[in-house]
Amino acid sequence: MNEELLKKMQRIKPEISNEVTDKGYVLTLSGRVSKNYWEDDDNICVETIDNELKDVEGDITIRLNSGGGDVFEGIEIYNYLKSLDNTVIIEVTALAASAASIIAMAGDEIKMSTGS
């Protein structure tokens, strides 16, 4: 992998946030795909996503920006999202590389921002 690209991927600021809009529930996932091994980890993991989405009714939009990470965690997140009865819309806001590309494929609809 290109060293410059690797450095850019590592600089993606971790963020997990949510909001309810007139179009449904929006979950922003930014950062590394990996299990949370420590209490203060901010990784994108199935446990965090389950905590955010388990009681959501209606459409779910996931805004995704990640350089990837643990492929097995990515597969677990994919399987979790596919198991939901909700319509899942994935919006790739900048980057969905490696394990994050697996997560992106879980959407019933996938939108890519210009330049992503």
Where are these regions (language model features)?
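N-terminal organellar transit peptides
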Residues: M1-A99, M105-S116
